[in-house]
From Swiss-Prot:
Ligand binding (ATP): T29, L30, G31, P32, D86, G87, T88, T89, T90, G413, D494
Single GO molecular function: unfolded protein binding
The enzyme's E.C. designation: 5.6.1.7
Organism: Mycobacterium avium (strain 104)
PROSITE patterns assigned: CHAPERONINS_CPN60
Lineage: Bacteria, Bacillati, Actinomycetota, Actinomycetes, Mycobacteriales
One GO term describing the cellular component: cytoplasm
Name of protein: Chaperonin GroEL 1
Subcellular location: Cytoplasm
Any one biological process term the GO annotation gives: protein refolding
Amino acid sequence: MSKIIEYDETARRAIEAGVNTLADAVRVTLGPRGRHVVLAKAFGGPAVTNDGVTVAREIDLEDPFENLGAQLVKSVATKTNDVAGDGTTTATVLAQALVKGGLRLVAAGANPIELGAGISKAADAVSEALLASATTVSGKDAIAQVATVSSRDQVLGELVGEAMTKVGVDGVVSVEESSTLNTELEFTEGVGFDKGFLSAYFVTDFDAQQAVLDDPVILLHQEKISSLPDLLPMLEKVAESGKPLLIIAEDIEGEALATLVVNSIRKTLKAVAVKAPFFGDRRKAFLEDLAIVTGGQVINPDTGLLLREVGTEVLGSARRVVVSKDDTIIVDGGGAKDAVANRIKQLRAEIEKTDSDWDREKLQERLAKLAGGVAVIKVGAATETALKERKESVEDAVAAAKAAVEEGIVAGGGSALLQARKALDELRGSLSGDQALGVDVFAEALGAPLYWIASNAGLDGAVAVHKVAELPAGHGLNAEKLSYGDLIADGVIDPVKVTRSAVLNSASVARMVLTTETAVVDKPAEEADDHGHGHHHH
């Protein structure tokens, strides 16, 4: 396929136009008075959302060069979402401001490489300053506050706060759709761990990209499973019972994995394969924990149990299992309650006895997994569209609350970013030339999120930025109440992890755009005869 190539300023301008188109669509959702975006769907009714990353994912532009810019910014939003689960709009707006300010200087003759280096140094300095100024979060009310800001809904915020407090930092909070109109919280005995499915073909719920198994049997295997003859007898027995199967082993590969995938596609047997977490002795111990929780046995050649010889009596069970690409949650395992209680007691005793901090930490992790349980927030709403939007905002709120507990919080509403400019004064003094200009571009861009939060609330963005810059740390604009004051006291807060991810990811994309000299895209098919390619940025 032949290509079209653009160079220098023309390439950068086209990419900038794409960055702007995407960012302009996303930025209207920023802040407590942010607006909604309606997305037309190929199937079913339109979706209504105020979640930046959901809007970004939907956007593809017609002009191939502009589309490059849009996709670059989209990667900022998705990456921030993956790391912190929130803050996607802030990241997008920052990236837009950095690209705009940076390209202006490049057009005026600044060296893009030096400029980019200045931007990176500034991003690191701001990230450090944010971490240093963060307040730790503990207690139900503080967590609820973070979740309320994220979901813009006090009731949901309090639910998330309660869920997080009950299961603790290491516990699992999962979000499901409720069959009723109410949103409620349930606690179940469950265990979660950070390993997901080995093949995307196992997915059963395509919207959520999860494999959900109801009332499954669970096979725990100490070693790798690769040969089909070993696994086949067990698969046949499970297929007869008609129950779905979860396999957790050191690894599942080759013929064995291929057979599970084929069976899943043909729907002859609903199965999901997951790698066991951890390594060596820790993996062994964790599999034993799972055996106790699910009421099964770990199949281990060392103890004389061979996969091809055992029957279904070694399988554990659970009420339901949810597996995503990164984690697995086993809810209501079929193991005896007193056996689980004894295991917890034994772990507590080991924690007290051990001298090594590392061992203690790992034992505590296992204890939290066993004792923590799983909080399930069941989200209800009147219509399908409202349900989807509500579920999204609960998921964001849970992610924000987790991030807040991990690294702490800073003042929200874009003011922590704006006030982090102070951290750049010293850095700028130590740099010269175009690197110093890069720091200036960054300092300028730090006002962008606040500018748009204020504009979306109907205020003058520039005035708000000027005012907040003069206020003491932690004070800023409360766009909900349209007043200036102590944001932390008012509960206008952001998890610092979210804010930092936005800063670092937007800087890395801006740097890529600034240092672009050539853009190469596929030639659109219908323009094959026409050598000009109607560009409107020259």
